[in-house]
Amino acid sequence: MEFDCEGLRRLLGKYKFRDLTVEELRNVNVFFPHFKYSMDTYVFKDSSQKDLLNFTGTIPVMYQGNTYNIPIRFWILDSHPFAPPICFLKPTANMGILVGKHVDAQGRIYLPYLQNWSHPKSVIVGLIKEMIAKFQEELPMYSLSSSDEARQVDLLAYIAKITEGVSDTNSKSWANHENKTVNKITVVGGGELGIACTLAISAKGIADRLVLLDLSEGTKGATMDLEIFNLPNVEISKDLSASAHSKVVIFTVNSLGSSQSYLDVVQSNVDMFRALVPALGHYSQHSVLLVASQPVEIMTYVTWKLSTFPANRVIGIGCNLDSQRLQYIITNVLKAQTSGKEVWVIGEQGEDKVLTWSGQEEVVSHTSQVQLSNRAMELLRVKGQRSWSVGLSVADMVDSIVNNKKKVHSVSALAKGYYDINSEVFLSLPCILGTNGVSEVIKTTLKEDTVTEKLQSSASSIHSLQQQLKL
């Protein structure tokens, strides 16, 4: 098929890097001339829509001595080639999807090549070659029996809409055996915080298997040292599928973009999470997602939206470290006649956090509460949040989750419906943590209207920024 270069340029009028995209697709046409190109509407996880270039066709896969033509569809984002394509199987009415390491129930394709996409070394031809190689190891489709073909209509309609709910229609599930008794934890990110979380979790002996996903290029020192000195039960990998069947997935990664504006910096984090969260959610569909990336309130919201997990299974580290420190200071430094467990730091991380008590007025009088709070907060302000401190706090939360301890932590949870907050924002609130994440939000006593106002102000500013992000 002759490649219509000028026609493609017209279709890509709104693409940021049109010439680079056209040149790459010209190269794709050399190897796969039968692909058909069109401009159609893609529906993202947040229900937003965008007209995107996509191409369809088949790729030849040799499996057990037979050649299969696997139908695929690639969606090219308007930021291509700096963002990877979104790839799907395109089954016909007599084909079913085999859910596996690289394919979910809706036919979306997940590959290491996509996860590690980096222009200019990553190209579509290279992606297709890896796709063929992976499908030769694990065929992604099977022929339906005549009785199943009628039910296939639902899946085809679903794929046509390009939405991403949870469905097992005409799909065969993969390897559930690891999900029975193993306490498997995954830490995403090989930076200082990722290393700190890995060491703290390892030291507490929480995990039977602990996976550290180091997504950086080359040897970055710390992860190399972990490989050299070989911690028991710790696996270091760059393949997201190594995280499969984790009970908790911890996000510590942050984009180090050179953007000038705060919005651009946050958006670069969002762009990175768009490539990570759906894949990690696919590999560990029953996990709790724990976010330590910054800004934690916004990135927890982003993770929730991209994962489509229920809100109770997506939490951020919030003010847990500050709360634990504050309780320790009140009990052990100020020697107050209270356990300290009635006081919490809640709200937004940083300068806008607030202090509250959990409704046990009879334990400490209001006057004493104010005096203790002021003195404790002064001591707390001199404490920094070093990576190792945050790592210890994360390990404590993970312990509560995997061992179902029903312990109260101040974590970033969906705050809608609390303190007259009506928007979908995450703020740190005292929550009981267990196997399924947040099982209950603890009510606190807010005697001062200024505290409620501060929480609502934080919610408003966070919501405003979220509205400007592109998910």
From Swiss-Prot:
Summarize where NAD(+) binds, as residue positions.
191-219
Stored PROSITE patterns: UEV (PS51322)
Query: GO molecular function: any one?
Result: oxidoreductase activity, acting on the CH-OH group of donors, NAD or NADP as acceptor
Alphabetical UniProt keywords: NAD, Ubl conjugation pathway
Question: What role does this protein play?
Answer: Possible negative regulator of polyubiquitination.
Reported tissue expression? Colon, colon carcinoma cell lines, normal cervical epithelium, carcinomas of the uterine cervix and peripheral blood leukocytes.
Q: Which GO terms describe its biological process?
A: carboxylic acid metabolic process; endosome to lysosome transport; protein modification process; protein transport
Q: What is this protein called?
A: Ubiquitin-conjugating enzyme E2 variant 3
Instruction: Provide the family line.
Output: In the N-terminal section; belongs to the ubiquitin-conjugating enzyme family. UEV subfamily. In the C-terminal section; belongs to the LDH/MDH superfamily.
Could you tell me which InterPro entries the record lists for this protein? L-lactate/malate_DH (IPR001557), Lactate/malate_DH_C (IPR022383), Lactate/malate_DH_N (IPR001236), Lactate_DH/Glyco_Ohase_4_C (IPR015955), NAD(P)-bd_dom_sf (IPR036291), UBQ-conjugating_enzyme/RWD (IPR016135), UEV_N (IPR008883)
SUPFAM superfamilies xrefs: LDH C-terminal domain-like (SSF56327), NAD(P)-binding Rossmann-fold domains (SSF51735), UBC-like (SSF54495)
Q: Name one Pfam family in it.
A: Ldh_1_C
Q: Which PANTHER family match?
A: L-2-HYDROXYCARBOXYLATE DEHYDROGENASE (NAD(P)(+)), UBIQUITIN-CONJUGATING ENZYME E2 VARIANT 3
List residues of the UEV domain. 2-145
How would you summarize the oligomeric state and partners of this protein? Homodimer.
GO CC, alphabetical: ESCRT I complex; extracellular exosome
Source organism per UniProt: Homo sapiens
